[in-house]
């Protein structure tokens, strides 16, 4: 995949509306051969994000919906770290008033981590390395949710295979935003049945 496009897509897919959207990506499966470079690039972008009130100039990360959302993000990050993941930036609630959580990158997330099983609904980007296409599909489908997936590849044939193999209702190919008023909206598994639009 074009790493620049993949990083840009990841930023859009994760941090739009602070990750508090049903179409926000939760798990980022990255091929092992480029995972270090991808992690570094995403970490640099996330470190540069400004946190604060939406009325402040240049703010990119605002508050989460409530204290429970902050606690959930903190708990998911903590569990991932206990199981062997590394926080490359962020990882904690922001000190002071409000329900702010630092934009966070968690790398080398291990199988069995809660962050891989639950919807995050917060500014936490979890990176899982994979070895080959079959490994990526297995990891991607290992969830009870299936609303949307985002695939970045330079291979049209691989993109077509992913459409058939990934258990999601929608898929963005080389884009970080999949919602479109002109396209049907819907998911699989616990993300709903059927389509709207």
Question: What are the language-model segments listed below?
Answer:
Residues 1, 11, 50, 93, ...:
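Conserved C-terminal structural/oligomerization subdomain of aldehyde/semialdehyde dehydrogenase
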């Amino acid at each position: 995949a074009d790493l620049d496009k993949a990083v840009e897509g990841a930023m859009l897919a994760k941090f739009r509306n602070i990750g508090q959207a049903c179409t926000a990506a939760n798990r980022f499966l990255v091929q092992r051969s480029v995972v270090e470079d991808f992690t570094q690039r995403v970490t640099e972008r996330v470190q540069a994000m400004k946190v604060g009130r939406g009325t402040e100039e240049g703010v990119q990360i605002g508050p989460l919906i409530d204290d429970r959302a902050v606690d959930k993000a903190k708990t998911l990050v903590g569990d991932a770290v206990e199981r062997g993941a590394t926080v490359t930036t962020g990882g904690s609630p922001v000190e002071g008033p409000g329900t702010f959580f630092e934009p966070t990158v968690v790398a080398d997330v291990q199988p069995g981590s809660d962050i891989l099983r639950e919807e995050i609904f917060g500014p936490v980007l979890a990176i899982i390395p994979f070895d080959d296409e079959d490994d990526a599909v297995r990891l991607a489908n290992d969830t009870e949710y299936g609303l949307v997936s985002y695939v970045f590849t330079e291979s049209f044939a691989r993109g077509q295979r992913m459409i058939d193999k990934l258990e999601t209702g929608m898929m963005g190919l080389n884009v970080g935003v999949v919602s479109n008023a002109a396209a049907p909206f819907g998911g699989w598994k616990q993300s709903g049945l059927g389509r709207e639009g």
